[in-house]
Amino acid sequence: RDLVRSRGLGDVYKRQPLISRAKEKKELAQVFQALRIAVNGEMDALESFLNQCVEALRPGGRLAVITYHSLEDRMVKNFMRTGRTDGHEEKDLFGRSSSPMKPLGSKPIVPTDDEVERNPRSRSAKLRVATKL
């Protein structure tokens, strides 16, 4: 049967016998998030954006990216650390990293408890900053 509306997908999902009713809302949100990411090509767009930033920034310029889920965050973290979204570090003949970026700090900046209380949507946000070498 064709799924025309999101409610139809939710109904199909709820009929599955292994779905935990306590986790139903979170799991269903993840299904819709995965569909949105795939349909909108969000990961491809992010990868393209990151690669273009290297060309757009001058040496010493800073790149700041806010991510909202782990797939985005992993891609941004890898890019800022290695210069590649897959995390594979390229090295020169002397074994030195040839990454065009250097992360500022090893951990992302996350919202405070007070900010999350005022703005619940911020709870999953992570800010990462890097400098172009």
Predicted segments, located by residue:
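S-adenosyl-L-methionine-dependent methyltransferase catalytic core, i.e., the SAM/SAH-binding region
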Residues: 1, 6-133
